[in-house]
Amino acid sequence: MSVPSSAVRTYRITALAGDGIGPEIMQVGRAVLDAVAAQVGFSLQWQEGLIGGAAYEATGDPLPPETLKMAQESDAVYLAAVGDFKYDTLPREKRPERALLGLRAGLGLFANLRPVKIFPQLVQASSLKPEVVAGIDLVVVRELTGGIYFGQPKGIFTDAKGSRRGVNTMAYSEAEVDRIARVAFELARKRRRKLCSVDKANVLEVSQLWRERVTAIAAEYPDVELSHLYVDNAAMQLVRWPKQFDVILTENLFGDILSDEAAMLTGSIGMLPSASLGSSGPGVYEPVHGSAPDIAGQDKANPIAQVLSGAMLLRYSLDQPQAADRIEQAVEAVLAQGYRTADIYSEGMTLVGCREMGEKILAALAQQQASPQGSLSAPGG
């Protein structure tokens, strides 16, 4: 059934293609989002901004003020990838990756969500035994703005005797722990209602406060089962039996490490999306993988993480869960048909490039419902 044009809701999305393979995977992601929007009955108004190396080349700034303003005025930010080895010699504040910190700060983002779900068709791609990884479906919720990356004092200091000393400070306030805990509990409530909080409360005072506050917030969610693990044990358990986890909540440094460990359970980082959220305003949705400059422009990139990041955008920022489900089902259908990009290819499968993988996903969407579909040659404008 068609939707009357007057009833169609329009969302403003900021697209930040960035560097390396970013423009290629962004083209696929936008086409898929436009296609599913046409099916479900809403529209996307795209605005393009510069970020990372591309922004530095054009403006001398990896995050130009106009890009941040555009992001702040949008309903969601769809990001591809930033960075290139050629920028490694730039001053730290000019490097492409610094744009991500500025974007998160400018949008007030404090919660990073990384879903880790293995498609049945890719169980063999994992380095772990199939019986260990089959059925994995967990989310790592990482606090983004506190902890040792931001605590003060920090730096390298020289004492009176001329000896240098490096200092970083891991610190969290009650308010910071409470707000990230509520994000994790709300997410767990919508899933299997199990939350595991990861800390190092046996030796770190900051973790003792973390555990105390998470336990206190748990009283607001009696329907969610809370458990605690020390981070070293959590790292071991993720490899030993990852299916025990539903939602993992942890602080910045621990989350940085555990989310990458969890990512590799699936066999390819090219499959994994992420979301960074705040209390209000637009979230940022991006693949976990980097810009892969070594394969940029060669049609070799895997666009699936970008596509699945779009599904998260629909679910968390636009409140369009039906559209998100359609995208995820289309990706699974294409994998079931045996199509693989190089990073997930195995013998007997059909090797395709970035663009063709996108076309296959669009075709799978079209099979779900006979509606006008997007095209990779003309993503929405």
From Swiss-Prot:
InterPro entries: IsoCit/isopropylmalate_DH_CS, IsoPropMal-DH-like_dom, Isopropylmalate_DH. It is found in: Cytoplasm. GO terms for molecular function: 3-isopropylmalate dehydrogenase activity; magnesium ion binding; NAD binding. Binds 1 Mg(2+) or Mn(2+) ion per subunit. GO terms for cellular component: cytosol. It holds the Pfam family Iso_dh. It catalyses: (2R,3S)-3-isopropylmalate + NAD(+) = 4-methyl-2-oxopentanoate + CO2 + NADH. Its main location: cytoplasm. Its EC number is 1.1.1.85. Keywords: Amino-acid biosynthesis, Branched-chain amino acid biosynthesis, Cytoplasm, Leucine biosynthesis, Magnesium, Manganese, Metal-binding, NAD, Oxidoreductase. GO terms for biological process: L-leucine biosynthetic process. Its cofactor is Mg(2+); Mn(2+). Substrate binds at residues 104, 114, 142, 232. Mg(2+) binds at residues 232, 256, 260. SUPFAM superfamilies: Isocitrate/Isopropylmalate dehydrogenase-like (SSF53659). The record marks 149, 200 as: Important for catalysis. The keyword Manganese applies. The keyword Amino-acid biosynthesis applies. NAD(+) binds at residues 290-302. Pathway: Amino-acid biosynthesis; L-leucine biosynthesis; L-leucine from 3-methyl-2-oxobutanoate: step 3/4. Homodimer. Catalyzes the oxidation of 3-carboxy-2-hydroxy-4-methylpentanoate (3-isopropylmalate) to 3-carboxy-4-methyl-2-oxopentanoate. The product decarboxylates to 4-methyl-2 oxopentanoate. Belongs to the isocitrate and isopropylmalate dehydrogenases family. LeuB type 1 subfamily. HAMAP family: LeuB_type1. This is 3-isopropylmalate dehydrogenase. It comes from Synechococcus sp. (strain JA-3-3Ab) (Cyanobacteria bacterium Yellowstone A-Prime). The gene is leuB.
